[in-house]
Amino acid sequence: MFPFDRKDSAAMVLDREKQLYSSRSVADKFAILETIRLELDRLYREDRPRYDELEKALRPATRQALEDSWKLWNPVPKSHVDWVGPGEMTCRLRPTHPDFAECAACNFTQCTYDEHGSPDFSKVTFPGSVVDISDLYDRLSVENIQKRGGSAASLQELAQMRMVPELQPVIKKWARETGNPEDFWEWRNALNLVPHEDTDCRTMRLVYRPVHVVFKHRGGVANAINIKNHFGA
């Protein structure tokens, strides 16, 4: 992200805003929008008159994209959890949570989120599954970005196919030991893994399904669609 000089944050925000309407990647535009959002968050807390003035100076599409970004922060766990740690950014499941046992079986009953709403799934990421998909966000339509499986044109399917070369030895070993076909999709489902599009619109990884379901989050697909809807790609 781009650091702001607080003495001239309004000028910096408006300069960053211009970059949203230039020829840049979805991932870069997401990073720029986040820089603006975080600075506006700070001004809202510390200097409301300056915030109000700056918010009015932004273009309508920028304001709507920011509004959508703030809404995307909302789907985080709220029931049977405690928010702990610095800034209360770590979500810890209580034993009363209905999915506590499943997450405990994955050795993952708490998750830390960053200021962008991104969950740290590094401990439950299957080794070798992380792939760069930033180009897919740029070239695919919104329809194919949000499509969930069942189509070779969808982001989810194209992205997961990029994992196969790195994971092939693991899949071969699993097929040999279980007598199952040497198939990525069967292997993935047998291990209860699901794709997770990282918040930054740059990468995808495989994580364990219970964790992905329980620790709700702001994902790359929603962020990319927000960017494409308001600023193109």
Residue ranges and their predicted role:
Residues 2-194, 198-233:
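Nuclease and nuclease-like effector domains acting on nucleic acids or nucleotide cofactors
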